[in-house]
């Protein structure tokens, strides 16, 4: 079977919340200023905060969101990468959960729809958010258009100019993208005054988006890291469990890339559910990131700010520091300084392994994948591909083929200019 499709009538109608199943209680956020929690209450949609700390394992997806999931391309297919399997020696089976098949071209729309819906329930004048490479920003723009909500998107400055096509997508959906740091917030003005040539960072953009929402009557929505955002995205993993069962397959490995952690967690957590509940983890879970932003392999597991402006509460997570300004790599979605607290805890317990690959290695595999499978991965997604060679090499000579499930988080059709620059195309 090359393609595993799930009928819309069979699409899961619940999300999965990992909090009740973690091996130990998630460290609580800290408010060192005495103002961070109050800021959260004002800035974030009410229902999103309820989900953030909920202990309900399988909350039902509201009907309005469920309907929009189907409108934007869900369920997404799982496709077997047979040509890549052969290239790697034929001793593993590779299945790709194709989140690139959504209208926005990535997994980000899965939570954007939920966040915007709940902001609308709060009668928000608009939503504001950050975005790195633009996948999250374009997803929020699409979700806002579908629910009739205005949106302001603070896009990391280096990506704002290097990735214009996602910015154009946002405009097409009626959104208002701004380069971050920007002149639209006092915080942005301060940063630009100190360093007018800054490439920006996701931490900076988060701070700007929060300030803009608070000062202008909007609601801030986060595109990764927080529990609720991961929860909303688990529709992908819930679908994948059904699809793999349909194919008579059970993955030995679950792999994917980490920017803030929501992409990988959304696929992996529903598979981890039964294992965590039984106390026995049998699958191998591997998350990969950018070596230029090595939070998983060189970061510390400690409390840190999720944003550069220190507006939000401190979270315990793997981090290389809230004030880290990453280099201007093309995988803008991987430039975040930390890893989601839930995923960080699992990494700290040895349940999830971590890898980091540099841009050259990742892009080499993006080229190979494109030639073998005929589909161009996003620069971020390409950072998961070197794991496949590692798995193939480690299982060479085994009698039974191992099964690998990959979160194919987005396509690279709007990133061709970046690939061209990096690979020196004419």
Swiss-Prot record:
The modification N6-(pyridoxal phosphate)lysine is found at residue 108. It comes from the Archaea. InterPro entries: Trp_synth_b-like, Trp_synth_b_CS, Trp_synth_beta/beta-like, TrpB-like_PALP, TrpB-like_PALP_sf. It is an enzyme of class 4 (lyase). It catalyses: (1S,2R)-1-C-(indol-3-yl)glycerol 3-phosphate + L-serine = D-glyceraldehyde 3-phosphate + L-tryptophan + H2O. The lineage of its organism: Archaea, Methanobacteriati, Thermoplasmatota, Thermoplasmata, Thermoplasmatales. Its cofactor is pyridoxal 5'-phosphate. Pfam families: PALP (PF00291). Belongs to the TrpB family. This is Tryptophan synthase beta chain. Pathway: Amino-acid biosynthesis; L-tryptophan biosynthesis; L-tryptophan from chorismate: step 5/5. Its EC number is 4.2.1.20. Keywords: Amino-acid biosynthesis, Aromatic amino acid biosynthesis, Lyase, Pyridoxal phosphate, Tryptophan biosynthesis. The beta subunit is responsible for the synthesis of L-tryptophan from indole and L-serine. One of its GO terms (cellular component) is cytoplasm.
């Amino acid at each position: 079977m090359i393609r595993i499709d799930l009928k819309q009538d069979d699409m899961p109608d619940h999300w999965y919340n990992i909090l009740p199943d973690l091996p130990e209680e998630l460290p609580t956020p800290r408010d060192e200023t005495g103002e961070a929690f109050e800021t959260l209450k004002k800035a974030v949609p009410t229902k999103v905060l309820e989900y953030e700390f909920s202990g309900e394992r399988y909350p039902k997806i509201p009907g309005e969101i469920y309907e929009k999931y189907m409108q934007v391309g869900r369920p997404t297919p799982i496709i077997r990468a047979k040509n890549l399997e052969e290239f790697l020696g034929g001793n593993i089976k590779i299945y790709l959960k194709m989140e690139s098949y959504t209208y926005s071209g990535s997994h980000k729309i899965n939570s954007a729809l939920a966040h915007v819906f709940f902001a609308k329930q709060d009668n928000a004048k608009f939503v504001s958010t950050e975005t790195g490479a633009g996948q999250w920003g374009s997803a929020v723009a699409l979700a806002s258009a579908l629910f009739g909500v205005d949106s302001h998107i603070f896009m990391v400055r280096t990506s704002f100019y290097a990735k214009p096509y996602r910015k154009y997508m946002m405009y097409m959906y009626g959104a208002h993208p701004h380069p971050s740091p920007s002149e639209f917030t006092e915080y942005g003005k301060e940063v630009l005054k100190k360093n007018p040539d800054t490439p920006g960072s996701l931490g900076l953009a988060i701070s700007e988006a929060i300030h803009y929402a608070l000062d202008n009557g909007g609601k801030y929505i986060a595109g990764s890291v927080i529990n609720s955002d991961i929860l909303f995205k688990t529709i992908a993993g819930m679908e994948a469990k059904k699809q793999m069962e349909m194919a008579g397959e059970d993955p030995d490995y679950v792999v994917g890339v980490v920017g803030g952690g929501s992409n990988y967690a959304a696929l992996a957590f529903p598979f981890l559910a039964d294992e965590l509940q039984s106390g026995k983890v049998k699958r191998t879970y591997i998350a990969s990131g950018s070596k230029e932003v090595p939070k998983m392999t060189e970061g510390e597991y400690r409390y840190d700010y999720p944003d550069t402006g220190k507006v939000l509460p401190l979270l315990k997570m793997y981090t290389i520091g809230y004030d880290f300004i990453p280099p201007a790599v093309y995988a803008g979605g991987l430039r975040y300084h930390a890893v989601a607290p839930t995923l960080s805890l699992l990494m700290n317990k040895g349940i999830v392994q971590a890898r980091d690959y540099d841009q050259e290695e990742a892009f080499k595999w993006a080229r190979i994948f494109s030639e073998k499978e005929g589909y161009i991965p996003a620069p971020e997604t390409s950072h998961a591909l070197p794991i496949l060679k590692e798995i193939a090499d480690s299982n060479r000579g085994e009698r039974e083929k191992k099964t690998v499930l990959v979160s194919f988080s987005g396509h690279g059709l709007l990133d061709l200019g970046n690939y061209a620059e990096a690979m020196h195309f004419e």
